[in-house]
Structure formats: C-alpha cells, structure tokens
C-alpha cells in the first residue's frame, strides 16, 4: 500500500482530535473530488512498518489525547489496500484499546466483498458512497454529498 499524507493530529476528518491517513488508489474517480492526487495506486509513498509503528505510537501518546483514527484517500477499501488496512485496524484493536476507527470509501456497504467486510467488521464508522458533485452540500457533516451515508457500526 502507498499513502499520500499522514496527519498525527487532525480535528477536521472525524470527531475529536485524531490521526488521519490518506491512502493512494481509487477506482471511483468522482468528478469534483477534492483529493484527485490520491487516485493512482503508485502515487505517494510506501506505507512501511515504520509508518504503521508511528501511527500506533501517536494513538497511544498520552500527551495529546486522540479519539481515534480516520482512514481516507484515495480509497482504503480499494482491493489492493485492503490487506494493509486490515493489518493496521487489527493492530489498532490489539494495541490501542478504546480508539475509534472511521473509514471513508466510494464503495457502498452492500457492495463490499468478503475481504473488504473483514475491515468493516473491525471499524466503528463507515462513510460510504461516491462523491456526487450535483449532490454536494457544504452543510453536511463528515460527508461531501447527500448520497453518502454515515454508518455507525459499533
């Protein structure tokens, strides 16, 4: 997996103070997407064990209380990203108790395959659906267009 940006402290992409990772790779290519630079799978930089360790350390850093992590992109549920995203969320569950995990994807919840559902089974919130320019609404919270759904899973 590759990623474009990691924010160790973020107050924009989800509730509370959190970490945010923007991964590379998106097949949806939504017109009007605010993050087009993340579409190509080979863009950005490699997601390494060192970066994964940094995320875990940041989530456990007691100097700044972080509520959890937001995974966006690109698309964390792109088939090529799923193995690394699954490993990351499993590790967060094991090593960062009490931290919530939010994932944004262009796929719809009812369209996900078994591998993608393994990730969804471990997260707290899934924001699903492609961004639709004609349905854009700046008043929406945690989503860009009114067709997208915020699923509070656990």
Curated annotation (Swiss-Prot):
It comes from the Bacteria. Keywords: 4Fe-4S, Cytoplasm, Iron, Iron-sulfur, Metal-binding, Oxidoreductase, S-adenosyl-L-methionine. This is Anaerobic ribonucleoside-triphosphate reductase-activating protein. The keyword Membrane does not apply. GO terms for molecular function: 4 iron, 4 sulfur cluster binding; [formate-C-acetyltransferase]-activating enzyme activity; metal ion binding. GO terms for cellular component: cytoplasm. PROSITE patterns: RADICAL_ACTIVATING (PS01087). Belongs to the organic radical-activating enzymes family. Forms a tetramer composed of two NrdD and two NrdG subunits. [4Fe-4S] cluster binds at residues 26, 30, 33. Activation of anaerobic ribonucleoside-triphosphate reductase under anaerobic conditions by generation of an organic free radical, using S-adenosylmethionine and reduced flavodoxin as cosubstrates to produce 5'-deoxy-adenosine. SUPFAM superfamilies: Radical SAM enzymes (SSF102114). It catalyses: glycyl-[protein] + reduced [flavodoxin] + S-adenosyl-L-methionine = glycin-2-yl radical-[protein] + semiquinone [flavodoxin] + 5'-deoxyadenosine + L-methionine + H(+). Its EC number is 1.97.1.-. It holds the Pfam family Fer4_12. S-adenosyl-L-methionine binds at residues 32-34, 74. InterPro entries: Aldolase_TIM, NrdG, Organic_radical-activating, Radical_activat_CS. It comes from Salmonella typhimurium (strain LT2 / SGSC1412 / ATCC 700720).
